[in-house]
Amino acid sequence: LIFSELVLEITKGSDDPYSIAIINFEGPKNINNQISSIVSNDLNRTGEFRILRDNQLLSLPKNQEEINYDDFKLLNVDFIIMGATSQEDISNISVSYEIYSVNKKSKIRTSTIYGIPNRLRQLSHYISDGIYEEVTGIKGVASTRLLYVTEQMINSRSIFKLVVADADGENEQVLLQSREPIISPSWSPNSKEVAYVSFETGMAKVYIQNIASGSREIVLENNSQISSPSWSPNGNFLSLTLYQDGNAEIYILNLKNKN
């Protein structure tokens, strides 16, 4: 078997993207450089924005009073993003940001997000989503997470991994590693647990696993083929596909009594 890495590169987005000037935030330089970079990459990845950074701008205002809107109009900028970061101690950080409309010549949003330094990527993703929603009117997805299965050949044997990662592919967390297939991963409604089918014991079993603790339990096992666990909106039931006598049938599993 030959495996290759699949890379999808967005080379063209919207024909009329929003033009946004992201001015480096005030505060600790190392932190602000990371935030600006992550937010810029998040918005670029949507294909709906054209990002301008400090070295592309005619002026670098530090507050609303210093904004010369004509400087930004000359560059066809639609929105200006400014902000400031404050880190009072090693365990707490806050980021305030403002969005200005060049057309309206006014501030259209002010937000403050609190977090911890080692979750700076997640905090930055929330800022990206706030900007995206304010500009487009649609909720952003930068702060959401991906759930997927990978397969890798090691010593001529397949190794399967169930992985959770940020929407940009960073912060990968391996939930399960097995020499047997893992299929049909599914988020719980509160995003704290995942359901999936694993063949690690030689037969298909449905597991529910807590992402934070890693603890898991078997919620269904039988001699039939099982696939496609899917949560009910309230998180109390799973729908599953069972293959019996050559037929695929959909069943509902009550997670409280396992019936």
Which residue stretches match the model-derived regions?
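Sec/Tat signal peptide C-region and signal peptidase I cleavage site
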Residues: I2-S4
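Amphipathic beta-strand/beta-sheet edge segments enriched in Tyr/Trp
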Residues: L6, S40, N63-G130
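Short beta-strand->alpha-helix linker/helix-N-cap micro-motif
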Residues: E9-D70, I81-A84
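Short loop/turn segments that connect beta-strands within beta-propeller blades
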Residues: N103, D166-E170, N210-G214, N254-K258
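A flexible loop/linker signature enriched in serine peptidases of the S9 family
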Residues: K139, E151-K161, Q177-E180, V197-V206, ...
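Residue-level detector of Asp-centered blade-edge/turn motifs that repeat once per structural unit
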Residues: G140-A142, P189-N190, P233-N234
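Hydrophobic beta-strand positions that form the internal "hydrophobic ladder"
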Residues: L146, S191-A195, G235-S239
